Regions:
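Tryptophan-centered short beta-strand motifs
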Residues: 1-5, 121-123
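A diffuse structural propensity rather than consistent per-protein peaks
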Residues: 6, 14, 40-42
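Short proline/glycine- and polar residue-rich coil/turn motifs
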Residues: 102-107
Length: 129
């Protein structure tokens, strides 16, 4: 994904330059929906996607997934349910040594981190909290 240009005493940083950032923060691009069985996520526009007050089983994260991910791009998905909800990831996601979660637990927050794997063209699960 493309990060927003940063301005400071050294001037602007463009997406094609090589620059070392020291004491700088890169703010994640965040989008959210209150509840959806097929969430709409455009990976060109978000780093973190939040489902809040999830009141439905998630039947597919793949159905409305759009964007052109880059090698090793990171996607963070947050699900906060109103109860235990089933999760179906779909064909755009894969497990690694970390399994894809298949359900939320009550109203607990579920954080799932993915890294785009260009070898398989899938979002590979890298961590679950």
């Amino acid at each position: 994904g493309v990060r927003t240009a940063v301005k400071d005493s050294i001037g602007s940083v463009t997406p094609t330059s090589t620059t070392t950032f020291t004491n700088k923060r890169i703010t994640a691009r965040v989008d959210s929906t209150t509840s959806s069985a097929t969430p709409s996520i455009n990976t060109d526009n978000v780093d973190t996607y939040k489902l809040t007050a999830q009141a439905l089983d998630i039947t597919s994260f793949t159905t409305n997934l759009t964007g052109t991910p880059t090698d090793d791009q990171i996607l963070h998905i947050v699900i906060i349910g109103t109860g235990a909800r089933a999760i179906t990831w779909g064909s755009s996601f894969e497990a690694s040594t970390v399994a894809l979660p298949t359900t939320t637990v009550s109203t607990d927050r579920l954080d799932v981190y993915f890294i785009f794997n260009t070898a398989t063209s899938k979002w590979r699960c890298g961590g679950v909290w």
